[in-house]
Amino acid sequence: MLTIEDIKKIIPHRYPFLLIDRLEELEDGKRAVGIKNVTVNEDFFNGHFPDYPVMPGVLIVEALAQVGACAILNVEENKGKLAFFAGIDNCRFKEQVKPGDQLRLEVEIVRMKGPVGKGRGVASVNGKTVAETDLMFAIK
């Protein structure tokens, strides 16, 4: 298991935009599984929505991308580089994510060709899929 401090050595994201709390699994260049504990204290709940707090879907996708970036950037030749979003395809939101949920974020890197990679991300709460998407990364 990798802690938040370990994650910060791999990706450059910091509060308030670091959206993963720990990595439970990391296979360099292949896959990673992260956890985000969603609390009522998240800044985005102030406006999304004040009387009905729901985690924005785009932030779930960003959390998946951060997990995928950990898998890609922990490969020796990519250490110290940045992974940028290059595309999002086939994105679906299936359930709402609310305060108190523990978001499991699983990303499998399905292809790397030069500085471009593709991954498949699935976010779940209590074993139920809440979002899924295909991600494209560009390494710089």
Swiss-Prot record:
Its EC number is 4.2.1.59. It catalyses: a (3R)-hydroxyacyl-[ACP] = a (2E)-enoyl-[ACP] + H2O. It comes from the Bacteria. GO terms for molecular function: (3R)-hydroxyacyl-[acyl-carrier-protein] dehydratase activity. Keywords: Cytoplasm, Lipid A biosynthesis, Lipid biosynthesis, Lipid metabolism, Lyase. GO terms for biological process: fatty acid biosynthetic process; lipid A biosynthetic process. The active site is at H48. It is found in: Cytoplasm. SUPFAM superfamilies: Thioesterase/thiol ester dehydrase-isomerase. One of its GO terms (cellular component) is cytoplasm. Belongs to the thioester dehydratase family. FabZ subfamily. Involved in unsaturated fatty acids biosynthesis. Catalyzes the dehydration of short chain beta-hydroxyacyl-ACPs and long chain saturated and unsaturated beta-hydroxyacyl-ACPs. HAMAP family: FabZ. This is 3-hydroxyacyl-[acyl-carrier-protein] dehydratase FabZ.
